[in-house]
Amino acid sequence: MGQSKPLRATALIVEDDALQREMICLLLEESDFEVIECESAEAAELVLERNGDSLSLMMTDVNLAGHMNGVELAHIAKKCNPELGVIVTSGKPLQQELPDGAKFWSKPWVPLDVIREAERTLVEHEDKADRRH
């Protein structure tokens, strides 16, 4: 039954904690997103270089495996796709400035917030698609 609705948007989830990543992915898949998962900012950067313009949403933790953090990744993501919805999460106060248009969510966040953001992003995605046609 999960295939009854067409996938309308793609989200990139960047989280080195496998359980957190899986939970976010499940929430977004239930909201009709196609999901790309990455454990590190470096892996996500490759996805952004190849598919950045086709993404609608990126959610990343600040502290990630590898050399780059989520805030640095957010800046790269916005350069690749200025219209991309970007959410940066952390259990600690943010020490770096986010790019324009990016949002910061303090951990722990509520799963319902992910669903609401997904729904808002889908509406924006549909509006942009309608304007192109």
Where are these regions (language model features)?
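Two-component/phosphorelay signaling modules centered on CheY-like receiver
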Residues: 18-37
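Acidic catalytic/metal-coordinating carboxylates
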Residues: 40, 68-73
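A Lys-centered signature of the CheY-like receiver
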Residues: 107
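Acidic, metal-coordinating helix/loop segments flanking the phosphotransfer/catalytic sites
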Residues: 37-57
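Active-site residues of response regulator receiver
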Residues: 61-62
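Non-catalytic signal-transmission and effector/linker regions of two-component phosphorelay proteins
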Residues: 1-12, 18-19, 25, 54, ...
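Short amphipathic alpha-helix used as the core "switch/output" element in two-component signaling
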Residues: 45, 71-83
